[in-house]
Amino acid sequence: MAVILAVEDDLFILQSLELVIEDLGHNALLASDLAGALLHLEAPGHIDGLFTDIRLFALGSGGYDVANQAIALRPDLPVLYTSGSVLSDEMIGRFVPGGRFLQKPYSSAQLESSLEELLR
């Protein structure tokens, strides 16, 4: 059983992420912004993967900030980004090394597959 930190500012999507993660047999840690993510990242305990929306509407932070802070605290943490924006070279250039991407909208099956791949 893995622990996945999901960061998403849309609470409906965040609740859906929790259900999918738990249906896969994993534990979900949830945050809607960088501050919430840092509470989990700075706490003791293992986190196996980070799933973050690139566009978070909290002032001054986004998924890139979440991922960069996560990697600073937990260098081996695999990261899966998501966004409704079309993936561009600029976006890819801001990914942490090894970062992956899942385009919104995605199906539950696509999310499940991407999360399982992230944890390999």
Regions found by a protein language model. Give the residues of each.
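Conserved acidic carboxylate
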Residues: 8
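Acidic, metal-coordinating helix/loop segments flanking the phosphotransfer/catalytic sites
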Residues: 30-49, 57
